[in-house]
Amino acid sequence: MKLLTLKFFILLVVLFIPNTVNSKELNGLKNLVIYEDQKKISEISFKNEKDNDVSLSDYENKLLILNFWATWCEPCKEEMPSLQNLQNNSKFKNLKILPINIGQEDKNSIKKFFSDVNINTFEIFYDTDVKLAKKFSLRGIPTSILINKDGYEFAKVIGSINFEDPKFVNWLLNYD
């Protein structure tokens, strides 16, 4: 019995220690994971509404939030207005939010979605071949990847949050 208990304890340590060593959460925002070891992002590209390639290097020296979403995703629909309000927050000088659709939906469906939730700030971006979703190991949507001005992924929001939450806004201002 002692051997079984010891094996179980070791399994728990192996499963949970790596997650606590490499990341932490901002108190009160359960879906935000902050990396202690930031990850350098290699050059990536995706498509805009005009089907042109867009590259992260197009946004040098910007604090980026890549928000992965789809029109059929209810949590995406709920958080999108708070993302728009964050983008429009005058406290941020270098913030750029890029909502990237991974639902393989046509432009008209996306425009209707934006209209239905009163979104008028954002451009339309696509990850039609889901390369970015794979690169960032997305497990579901919405997921937002936060990239600092030096091109390092420093946090991830897994699921939805209120991007207008004062705790989140004040924390994010440190990176602007």
Predicted features along the sequence, with ranges:
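N-proximal helix/coil linker or "cap" segments that precede and/or mark the start of modular domains
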Residues: 19-43
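Thiol/disulfide oxidoreductase modules built on the thioredoxin-like
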Residues: 112-120, 127-173
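Structural microenvironment flanking redox-active thiols in thiol-disulfide oxidoreductases
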Residues: 78-117, 128-134
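Active-site acidic short loop of glycosyltransferases
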Residues: 59-62, 92, 119-121, 138
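Hydrophobic beta-strand anchors of alpha/beta hydrolase catalytic cores
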Residues: 65-66, 97, 144
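Bacterial N-terminal signal peptides
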Residues: 7-16
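A short beta-strand-turn-helix
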Residues: 43-64
